[in-house]
Structures are given as structure tokens and as C-alpha cells.
Amino acid sequence: MAKATSSLVVPIIFLVIFALVEQNTGCFDYDVYQPCDHCRERCLKYYPVTRKAICRKNHCVCIGPCPNDKAIPNVKLFKNVKEQILS
């Protein structure tokens, strides 16, 4: 009986760890079929301004917080869009 109990301890520990630990990674959204021309404008068109546009392997990538992260005020979304596009 003791052997059966001890064989359940390790799986239970892993279940508890996976249930309590939250993965903290940024969200990546790949725009696979389009080259890097005007990557920042494309990211602003589909995602909030908190996303960063970079070019990886000739593909536009928008990196930023996950959608379920803190809410983004609408004022920041539309304020100085021209500056954000040019940056």
C-alpha cells in the first residue's frame, strides 16, 4: 500500500505545479505571407499600439502583450497615430 501511495505523489505534485504556475510569454502574431514593407502600419491596422513591429526572416511580426493583459485605454489608441506609424 505504501508503494502505491508513493507512486501517486509525483504525478500529483506535477498536476499542482501546472495548475498554479502561469506561463508568462509575450504574444506573437505572424503575418506570414507578406514581406516586411510597411510592417508598422500593418501592425497598427490589426493590433493595438502597444504592439511592436519587427521583421524576422522577411516576415512582419507584431509582438506585444496578450489580449487578456491589462486593458488599453481608447484615448491612447487614436492619439498621435501618425507619430506611432513613423516610429
Swiss-Prot record:
Disulfide bonds join 27-66, 36-55, 39-60, 43-62. One of its GO terms (cellular component) is extracellular region. Keywords: Antimicrobial, Disulfide bond, Fungicide, Plant defense, Secreted, Signal. The keyword 4Fe-4S does not apply. The keyword Nuclease does not apply. One of its GO terms (biological process) is killing of cells of another organism. Transmembrane segments: none annotated. Residues 1-23 form the signal peptide. It is found in: Secreted. Its main location: secreted. Belongs to the DEFL family. This is Defensin-like protein 175. It comes from Arabidopsis thaliana.
